[in-house]
Regions:
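A short beta-strand-loop structural module common to alpha/beta enzyme folds
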Residues: 27-38
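Acyl-group handling in specialized metabolite and lipid biosynthesis
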Residues: 168-179
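Structural motif
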Residues: 6-10, 32-34, 54-55
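Short N-terminal binding/cap micro-motifs at the start of the first secondary-structure element
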Residues: 11-16
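Donor/substrate-binding cores of folate-linked one-carbon enzymes
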Residues: 2-4, 17, 56-164, 171
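An anion-binding loop in the catalytic cleft
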Residues: 5-7, 19, 178-246
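Short, structured active-site "lid" loops
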Residues: 46-59
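Short amphipathic alpha-helix with an adjacent loop that forms part of the alpha/beta core around
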Residues: 39-46
Length: 246
């Protein structure tokens, strides 16, 4: 098939899709979504059989998905909608999450489901979950969706209901050392890593925290530095401590 990859940035998932599709013999082109009018122009010039959007930050123009079958990758299970799916999953402590291939539609992540995969959630940074579990699930779901399209199926399974979760407000990422448990602090950091970071006050100075892991023995005053080792510092929490790389 003649496939157009439409993406905000040619990120790891977009690159994986490009390589996998090319190796399977598909003719693949990449268009960066920088402006709706440029997207429409690119589609009209390329005349794709299928458009796949692995990573976007805004809606696909209606003029595109009304004329061309357009599949969107959403890093959440069917029924989940919104721009910060993995962030919310980590913050809420979900035990299982997923990724699905949807048809583009008027409302965010509300299109028909062509395929989906689920995976257990690790205690890990958002970027790690995205590049491993979410990416592997997305590739598997993509092949299932393509098989259905090649069989002549015209649409996926309609979503009966869904919950839209808005962008995670910066206040929900801010660490309160005296209220948040170590687990809650880690969730905020993991959900905000690699961006935008979890805002925290450490000994009177504000920092955006990344790359943290729990300490099993040391304890100290919440928000205070209690130890240093190599390129990391240990910060006390209300019920323990954690290490933060510097």
């Amino acid at each position: 098939m003649r496939i157009l990859l439409l993406c905000h940035r040619f990120n790891s998932l977009s690159q994986r899709f490009y390589c996998e599709l090319s190796e399977r013999g598909h003719e693949v082109s990449v268009e960066l979504d920088v402006h709706p009018e440029l997207t429409i122009e690119a589609v009209n010039l390329y005349k794709p059989d299928l458009i796949i959007a692995p990573f976007l930050k805004r809606k696909i123009p209606k003029e595109v998905w009304e004329k061309h079958l357009t599949l969107v990758v959403h890093p959440g299970p069917p029924g989940d909608r919104g721009p910060n799916a993995l962030d919310w999953a980590i913050l809420k402590g979900e035990k299982e999450w997923g990724v699905c291939i949807l048809s583009a539609a008027e409302d965010y992540d509300a299109g028909d489901v062509w395929a989906h995969r689920t995976f257990p959630m690790r205690r890990a940074r958002k970027a790690s979950l995205y590049r491993r579990e979410a990416t592997e699930g997305a590739v598997e779901a993509l092949w299932e969706a393509l098989e259905k399209i090649e069989r002549g199926e015209k649409r996926g399974r309609p979503q009966e209901d869904g919950v839209f979760n808005p962008k995670v407000d910066i206040s929900l990422r801010k660490i309160d050392w005296h209220r948040d448990s170590t687990e809650e602090v880690l969730r905020k950091i993991y959900a905000s890593d690699s961006q935008p970071g979890a805002l925290a006050n450490v000994e009177g100075e504000e920092y955006y925290l990344f790359n943290a892991y729990p300490e099993g023995f040391l304890k100290g005053e919440p928000g205070r530095l209690i130890a240093r080792r190599d390129n990391a510092v240990c910060i006390g929490t209300k019920d323990g401590a954690l290490w933060k790389a510097i």
